[in-house]
């Protein structure tokens, strides 16, 4: 079946849906997170055992954390993206919602593999380790994440309790530093909006998508169809992406963001040389009431 989500997977609350917002089944009038909020609520409410969503920058993991389910974004290319309407092609990945880790493992084992219709799908064999509760892991804790002023105190407190429990069970806790944390969200939004601007250009009322019945002529068809057909958040991101790709700004924004992305990846790879697992909050804040956040920038910081 089909489930509700933010329009073109652009949102962190599922309030940008063309079909109306999804309500968090755990608390009335609260959002479930987004963009895959419908998928999260379907599993959390017991409407289905498992569900799928797309995760570009947290769109599975964030609503999972707000609905008490297990959300997983597999490694890029592990699951085929064939059939997915692209938001940002170099970030998008199909993810899963389940009620337990075992179901997530089973679902991944079924879905993973090469797909001739998706050139980005991985050819590497998927291997699972046998569960061993006696095995001890090196668990990395990023200082800048836990000390960040934007992290909700309730989340910080719960994570500290988890860390203490892990220590008592014999796992090694390793303190790490990620000095580039303030560059994560800006870099993400420069690159994803740029890719969205390109990917959604085909929805012009001629080739794909809504076509304005009032339009007269080709140019007016393009303008009216996109103006009337897209929601406000989608239009906002298309405009931002078009700006960073425009002449005179491409090198200043898009090219620089690609370089920063490489730095961020290299820094992450270095952390995994010292650790087996990184323990981090899924989202900086907890679920909020519908219509509580009006500022798009504040909403972007939920990613």
Predicted regions and their residues:
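A structural preference for short, hydrophobic beta-strand core positions in alpha/beta folds
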Residues: 1, 173-175
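Charged, often glycine-rich, active-site loop that binds/positions anionic groups
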Residues: 13-20, 186-199
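Short, well-ordered beta-to-alpha junction loops that form the rim of enzyme active sites
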Residues: 3-4, 10, 144, 178, ...
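Glycine-rich, small-residue loops and helix-cap segments
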Residues: 48, 165-168, 173, 195, ...
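A short helix-breaking turn/cap at a secondary-structure junction
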Residues: 73-157, 162, 220-224
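Short glycine/serine-rich loop segments
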Residues: 2-109
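Flexible, acidic loop-helix segments that line cofactor/substrate-binding pockets
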Residues: 118-125, 137-138, 142-145, 176-189, ...
